[in-house]
């Protein structure tokens, strides 16, 4: 039996060891709990969050349910589909191979993937990383074919789609436009350079050394995922499952946990994998041929929040919403992984950061607060004032459309859940995303909408007059329109004062007239083009796919 002296010595040793060991992450913080209170229920999906401060995980907790069917709660070890947060790992893998001299970031991508067409302009590996390749986004292309958004996409199907393309959105390096196509190509590049799939390479080169034992790229949509949090979207007053089913990875595909992502966040400070040189490289901003730099680095975006520089990337697909938010000066990071389509992981991460960083952040500006709108930061406009801004707004450069409508007591983006909350008579904050919208008078007397993104990037739209359509004008657009690049035919028919697109067995798509010979649809903006007064083709602008043409089949 130990003596009193031996017991005292043992206590001293235990205390000393406890002081030297890393502190365990807290699982209680009332202020953080309040941020996630809407999800902290047994009948709701929710989120897992981890907080890293100066190399230590200081908070980790789950809110809501990983499985509503089986009553499984979310924990920091629940596995979530990371969506586009995956991109930083793909880019890091490519950077590792470049560091080892196995490829150059300035290699022509066709050196490794000859299936990419020769567009007459060199697309480099670096172009893929920074979204400056001009390659059309494959999600938009698949949507035009009628491929279901949750349907499986194999590497073979993806490469066949890419190989059919005859044009780019723009010359490589001349612009920045987000393209998931580029990051799937990067995953294929990793396989062809290293001889290992991205899943295998990341396991041995990244996840293993960092102890991220619950992370992997899921390149088989039928494979089981241990401790997976299923994803959900709202369906009236209840929830429905909304889980991706892709086999291609690189743009997404990563399953990970809040605990594992905390280990990844620490690597940006301690450089365990890659060393100092690679840590600096992956933060390098892209540069356009004009010499201008862009905020996008290696799957990471430079920005600022309340006066502090941040590096972040979010993700959204199916019902998953994810975010890694880092404050490099403070060596501070927040990871938010959600399985509810209603969650705004970016806003949640910012709110958590504000709890811990406190007065190290600048005061919230009333007009551009990144937090959710509050009574103190909004103004009330009459329905008449709101109606002045309703209408369709067109950006000819990007071929994108914004349709603004009055909804209840505010404005909204038509056919979306996004509300425009007024913070002044002319400026509005968009709910669920970090955008602001300002209305002004154009030089020609028209109304102009200026949209500002989270990194200060701006886009200008001009209000366009409503079209005058009748049965005769709509009938003039009817016919078959063919795309060899997609191997698909659209049949356009008038129906109920609109046009519809028929594509075989998939559901019809309605085209709603917006302005002269231009229609909006879930597939994008469709414009009919005339030559000598006759409609010869239609052109689709779908955000990340611009100027995509279908030729009108001749009528015999």
Each language-model region and where it sits:
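Bacterial N-terminal signal peptides that target proteins for export
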Residues: 1-11
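Sec/Tat signal peptide C-region and signal peptidase I cleavage site
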Residues: 21-25
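Short, conserved catalytic-motif segment at the N-terminal edge
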Residues: 27-82, 102-107, 111, 160-167, ...
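Active-site SXXK
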Residues: 33-36, 49, 55, 79-106, ...
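Short, well-ordered beta-strand elements
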Residues: 58, 312, 323-340, 447-452, ...
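Short, surface-exposed loop or secondary-structure junction motifs
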Residues: 67-68, 120-328
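Peripheral terminal and inter-domain segments
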Residues: 350-556
């Amino acid at each position: 039996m130990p003596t009193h002296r031996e017991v005292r010595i043992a206590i001293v040793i235990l205390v000393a060891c406890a002081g030297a060991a890393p502190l365990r992450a807290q699982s209680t913080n009332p202020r953080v709990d309040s941020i996630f209170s809407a999800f902290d229920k047994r009948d709701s999906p929710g989120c897992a969050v981890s907080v890293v401060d100066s190399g230590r995980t200081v908070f980790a907790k789950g809110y809501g349910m990983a499985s509503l069917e089986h009553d499984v709660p979310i924990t920091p070890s629940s596995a979530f589909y990371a969506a586009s947060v995956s991109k930083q790992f793909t880019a890091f893998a490519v950077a590792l191979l470049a560091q080892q001299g196995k490829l150059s970031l300035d290699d022509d991508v066709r050196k490794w993937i000859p299936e990419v067409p020769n567009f007459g302009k060199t697309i480099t590996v670096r172009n893929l990383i920074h979204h400056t390749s001009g390659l059309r986004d494959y999600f938009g292309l698949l949507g035009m074919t009628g491929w279901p958004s949750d349907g499986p996409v194999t590497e073979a199907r993806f490469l066949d789609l890419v190989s059919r393309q005859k044009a780019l959105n723009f010359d490589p390096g001349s612009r920045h436009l987000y393209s998931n196509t580029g990051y799937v190509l990067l995953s294929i590049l990793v396989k062809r350079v290293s001889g290992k799939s991205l899943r295998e390479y990341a396991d041995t080169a990244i996840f293993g050394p960092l102890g991220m034992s619950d992370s992997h790229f899921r390149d088989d949509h039928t494979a089981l995922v241990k401790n997976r949090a299923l994803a959900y979207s709202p369906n009236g007053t209840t929830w429905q499952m909304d889980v991706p089913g892709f086999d291609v990875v690189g743009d997404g595909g990563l399953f990970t946990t809040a605990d594992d992502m905390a280990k990844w966040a620490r690597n940006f400070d301690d450089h365990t994998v890659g060393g100092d040189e690679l840590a600096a490289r992956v933060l390098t901003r892209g540069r356009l041929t004009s010499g201008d730099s862009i905020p996008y680095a290696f799957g990471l975006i430079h920005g600022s929040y309340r006066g502090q520089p941040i590096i972040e990337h979010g993700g959204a697909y199916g019902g998953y919403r994810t975010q890694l938010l880092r404050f490099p000066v403070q060596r501070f990071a927040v990871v938010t992984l959600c399985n509810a389509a209603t969650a705004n992981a970016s806003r949640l991460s910012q709110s958590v950061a504000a709890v811990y960083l406190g007065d190290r952040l600048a005061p919230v500006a009333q007009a551009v607060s990144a937090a959710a709108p509050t009574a103190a930061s909004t103004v009330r406009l009459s329905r008449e004032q709101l109606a002045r801004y309703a209408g369709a707004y067109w950006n000819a450069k990007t071929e994108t459309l914004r349709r603004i409508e009055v909804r209840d007591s505010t404005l909204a983006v038509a056919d979306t859940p996004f509300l425009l909350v007024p913070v002044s008579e002319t400026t509005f904050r968009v709910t669920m995303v970090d955008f602001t919208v300002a209305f002004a008078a154009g030089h020609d007397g028209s109304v102009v909408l200026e949209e500002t993104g989270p990194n200060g990037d701006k886009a200008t739209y001009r209000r366009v007059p409503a079209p005058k359509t009748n049965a005769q004008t709509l009938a003039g657009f009817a016919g078959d329109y063919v795309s060899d690049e997609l191997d698909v035919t659209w049949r356009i028919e008038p129906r109920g004062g609109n046009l519809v697109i028929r594509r075989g067995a998939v559901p019809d798509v309605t085209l709603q007239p917006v302005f002269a010979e231009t229609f909006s649809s879930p597939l994008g903006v469709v414009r009919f083009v005339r030559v000598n007064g006759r409609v010869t083709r239609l052109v689709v602008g779908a955000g990340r796919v611009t100027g995509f043409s279908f030729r009108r089949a001749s009528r015999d």
